[in-house]
Swiss-Prot record:
The lineage of its organism: Eukaryota, Metazoa, Chordata, Craniata, Vertebrata. It is found in: Mitochondrion inner membrane. Binds 2 heme b groups non-covalently. This is Cytochrome b. GO terms for molecular function: metal ion binding; ubiquinol-cytochrome-c reductase activity. It comes from Chiroderma villosum (Hairy big-eyed bat). It is a multi-pass membrane protein.
Length: 379
């Protein structure tokens, strides 16, 4: 008798995606982050759903409703901190996932890569809107500064900002619509994840060597299911340790002060996972130029497949490109650090240097190094 998982209309889709899926035998732990992101999304949707049951999206009560969740709701503090730190874990996995794609040349699957970039933008938008909801001091001013950047768009900028705000400043209308979109977007993200997986399963997975692995495939279950479960355990242990021992480690103390439009914090900054882009934005003195650089810092990923000049797909056997890749990682860490510092000497010049290096490495140095490596290998 044929197994039901291979004949049932629904089960055979799950079977071909997670059980009998042929996978390269050489996948390292860097391929775990896709499934970890799935777990992060599930955790965020579940904790967010329960938080939404007690949260009120009104400027007068939003801050107090979050306090009520933490103090009066059963395990409300756990839900709140799992959701807040789960977002940080989400972005850690997301950046490692993108980094792995850059290192091993996964971007040559252009459809999967482009849907991934859309996902990155959608998750960033979701995180930004969720960031505003507790209505703390830094949340409020962060929302004001970031949304105000849209006023740099010529001709329609000011109208666009007021349209998003629902008035002449970040107020009740803004909070209500941000809550509505923050609730909706994760489900759009989940749908995009399905499209991402659909395109991935059309081509099959890349592998660390970057060479076709068709002759050497193994079934996804049990080999990679066990490997993924180990990844889940490690990530959930790290998340639990963060939530139960230092839940405010990655947050800002100003957010324990209710939002006050009459009192500006000395240094406005977003959450740590946006600091690299924020540093690039601040490093350009012109407002429109800064906004364009901010968008390009993420959108530049879309032209990485076009800039791939190497005859080899992966960086595994390209030591010069490896050096540049790790220099890029160092530049990103530097930008993240600078984004959290005040706008003064020497941070301004360090930020500008790191921003120039970021674009220079991706647009010029990496393609040039790839061409040189081809020449050295006489290809």
């Amino acid at each position: 008798m044929t197994n039901i998982r291979k004949t049932h209309p629904l089960l055979k889709i799950i079977n071909s995606s997670f059980v009998d899926l042929p996978a390269p035998s050489s996948l390292s732990s860097w391929w775990n982050f896709g499934s970890l992101l799935g777990v992060c999304l599930a955790v965020q949707i579940l904790t967010g759903l329960f938080l939404a049951m007690h949260y009120t999206s009104d400027t007068a009560t939003a801050f107090n409703s979050v306090t009520h969740i933490c103090r009066d709701v059963n395990y409300g503090w756990l839900l709140r901190y799992l959701h807040a730190n789960g977002a940080s874990m989400f972005f850690i996995c997301l950046y490692l996932h993108v980094g792995r794609g850059l290192y091993y040349g996964s971007y040559t699957y252009s459809e999967t890569w482009n849907v991934g970039i859309l996902l990155l933008f959608a998750v960033m938008a979701t995180a930004f809107m969720g960031y505003v909801l507790p209505w703390g001091q830094m949340y409020f001013w962060g929302a004001t500064v970031i949304t105000n950047l849209l006023s740099a768009i010529p001709y329609i900028g000011t109208d666009l900002v007021q349209w998003i705000w629902g008035g002449f400043s970040v107020d009740k209308a803004t909070l209500t619509r941000f809550f509505a979109f923050h609730f909706l977007l994760p489900f759009i993200v989940a749908a995009l994840v399905m499209v991402h997986l659909l395109f991935l399963h059309e081509t099959g997975s890349n592998n660390p060597t970057g060479i076709p692995s068709d002759p050497d495939m193994i079934p996804f279950h049990p080999y990679y299911t066990i490997k993924d479960i180990l990844g889940f355990l490690i990530m959930l242990t790290a998340l639990s340790a963060l939530v139960l021992s230092s839940p405010d480690l990655l947050g800002d103390p100003d957010n324990y002060i209710p939002a006050n439009p009459l009192n500006t914090p000395p240094h406005i900054k977003p959450e740590w996972y946006f600091l690299f882009a924020y540093a690039i934005l601040r490093s350009i003195p012109n407002k429109l130029g800064g906004v364009l650089a901010l968008v390009m810092s993420i959108l530049i990923l879309a032209i990485v497949p076009i800039l791939h000049m190497s005859k080899q797909r992966s960086m595994m056997f390209r030591p010069l490109s490896q050096c540049l890749f790790w220099l890029l990682v160092a530049v990103l860490f530097t930008l993240t650090w600078i984004g959290g510092q005040p706008v003064e000497h020497p941070y301004i010049i360090i930020g500008q240097t790191a921003s120039v290096l970021y674009f220079l490495i991706i647009l010029v140095l990496m393609p040039a190094t790839s061409i040189m490596e081809n020449y050295l290998l006489k290809w």
